[in-house]
């Protein structure tokens, strides 16, 4: 696919920005110090200066839309929407858990993302595919299962760590370009999954 994609991941403490051309990584900047508001614009600027690719040449902006940190989601999506509007480009919204799942070879497992305190967003996979809906629980509920997720310095031995990255966002964007792309950026909303939503079911 002959496309240039700017990819952004800000749903955890990691701020990750990358530029891909024809599915190949051109540049990547990442920082894990939760400085999204000060680094996101800087990373994007550096990418286009270093790559010598005009920002108007990109075909789309891929962005992780949650679940994840409320602050990180707001910063990332607001930036992506503003940039997309200014250069008249579409956005490719990507579910955070879907991006974390990118590259896992196991077939039956649980994928987790820390929400707050002892609680996690949890998605079960069977035969390599999503099984059921995302649910909200403590890690103890799946302690004896195969578990993947972003540990973010949490001392939880049962989790096989996977770092969020804009590289994974871009790979999914290429795979699902025609199905995921959204030209009307007003329709794109952050995926704020809250505990109360699970309790209503």
How should each PLM-predicted stretch be described?
Residues 60-96:
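DPxDG-like acidic metal-binding loop motif
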Residues 45-46, 81, 171-175:
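Short glycine/serine- and small hydrophobic-enriched flexible loop segments
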Residues 1-24, 37, 92-201:
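Oxyanion-binding and handling regions
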Residues 34-35, 70-74, 164:
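Short, conserved micro-motifs enriched in small and acidic residues
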Residues 32-49:
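N-terminal phosphate-binding loop and adjacent alpha-helix
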Residues 44-60:
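Phosphate/pyrophosphate-binding loops at sites that engage ATP/ADP/AMP, CoA/4′-phosphopantetheine
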